[in-house]
Amino acid sequence: MAETTQAVQAKPKRGMSKSLRDSLVAYSSIAPNFIGFCIFTLVPMIFAIGLSFCNWDGVHPVEFTGVSNFVALLSDKTFKAAFVNTLVYAIGTVPLTLVCSLGLAMLLNQKVKFRNFFRTVSFFPYVASLVAVAAVWNMIFSPSMGPVNQILATLGVENLPKWAAGKDTAMLTVILFSVWKNMGYYMVIYLAGLQGTNPELEEAAELDGASKWQIFWNVTLPQLKPTTFFVIIMLTIASFKVYDQMYMITQGGPGNATMTLVYYIYNVAFVNTPKYGYASAVSMVLFVLVLFVTIIQFKGSSSND
């Protein structure tokens, strides 16, 4: 009896499903950013949280000290000055930059001659090198040879301000510099927001006899609420972590008049004897401060919707 052999045919391999393929493409696209976030943000943040409960100078072994770093902050006069200065800088910078950038955007959104030229000029300080613009700013506001004080002297002002060199005027100088440098960037954001407003609502309000101020306050500004919220969040975070302006103009002085939290963290961690644990404790205070203010802003925005 002849044996019959049965050919075994291999089942064809099924190709990768479309959903799986799309998922792999998506994950491969976000993987570089996610890995970079973990390496350069998440891991250092976790390390800083742990280090805030320790003493470490970068050479000797890490010594766990509990909450002693945070207790020491309560009696640290320089930390208190930096904390207050950071709040003062934020309170001065955020509303001024907001108003100036919005006003500039409203002005340059009109059909005026050389509009594109003025937009470019307004944006230039933001993209220019901070070192260059800070040097020009220090020259303009020089107490002895600056053109600003020379104009004030011509007008008969006797006690000329020392600007960045004066303890009472140094913070004001840095605030004015920051507003001037950054308002061009937020002007562009507001210009983009103005392009999304409904002109028909403004025309209807104008036909109803509303003044320009009433149209702006009751029609245009409410439509810019998402843009304004974004600008406030960005300005607040930037003002709390300010460092470069202080370093280039005042170096945190005179005295501690312009010492901010980030500048203090830098001094504690990298100047003289490094105290990485103490600097990490200060950074945790800054993190909580930014988080607290941001949550309040989100709550306020949600309640007004």
What are these regions (language model features)?
Residues 1-20:
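Short, Lys/Arg-rich, polar N-terminal cytosolic tail immediately upstream
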Residues 22-305:
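A structural signal for multi-pass alpha-helical bundles of membrane permease subunits
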